């Protein structure tokens, strides 16, 4: 059975919206895994990322608006993992167990909730090496954009 669904963390989703180092790779993986699962807080992280890229001079105002619109369109097709209590419970233990930062802990916890805590090598797409290692240790098939 072909798996067309994958969990995407923000570092993998942002390059789908604007030209970045991993845009080509992200688009390649989107063709393979067109059904995207994201954490509830991903939109905030995407908007923060776009604001940072604009502030740092990597995006113009026009490019930022276009990228934000693209994210809004893409977001409508995503399955979003809500901030349920179990996400918080899992996220609380992940920094110690996997050495993750707080927001990355929410990403991995959301992915675990998505699969009922049975990753079974489901795809987890990220450009963050530390998060990729943690996802693999948790049982996901980590796809590191590099």
Positions of predicted regions on the chain:
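Short, well-structured N-terminal submotif of metal-dependent ribonuclease cores
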Residues: 1-43, 53-66, 140
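Helix-adjacent hinge/juxtasegments
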Residues: 52-84
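Acidic catalytic patch
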Residues: 42-43, 73-98, 105-110
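Short beta-strand scaffold positions
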Residues: 8, 38, 82, 102-105, ...
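Acidic, PIN/NYN-like endoribonuclease modules and their adjacent C-terminal/linker elements
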Residues: 1-5, 109, 113-146
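Alpha-helical elements of the RecA-like P-loop NTPase motor core of helicases
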Residues: 15, 24, 89, 132-133
């Amino acid at each position: 059975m072909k798996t067309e669904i994958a969990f995407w963390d923000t570092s993998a989703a942002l390059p789908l919206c604007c030209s970045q180092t991993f845009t080509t790779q992200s688009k390649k993986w989107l063709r393979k895994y067109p059904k995207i699962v994201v954490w509830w807080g991903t939109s905030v992280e995407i908007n923060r990322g776009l604001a940072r890229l604009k502030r740092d001079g990597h995006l113009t105002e026009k490019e930022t608006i276009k990228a934000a619109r693209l994210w809004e369109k893409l977001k409508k097709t995503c399955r979003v993992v809500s901030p349920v209590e179990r996400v918080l419970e899992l996220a609380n233990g992940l920094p110690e167990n996997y050495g993750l930062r707080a927001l990355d802990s929410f990403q991995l916890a959301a992915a675990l909730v998505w699969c009922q805590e049975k990753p079974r090598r489901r795809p987890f797409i990220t450009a963050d090496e530390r998060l990729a290692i943690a996802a693999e240790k948790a049982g996901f098939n980590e796809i590191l954009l590099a």
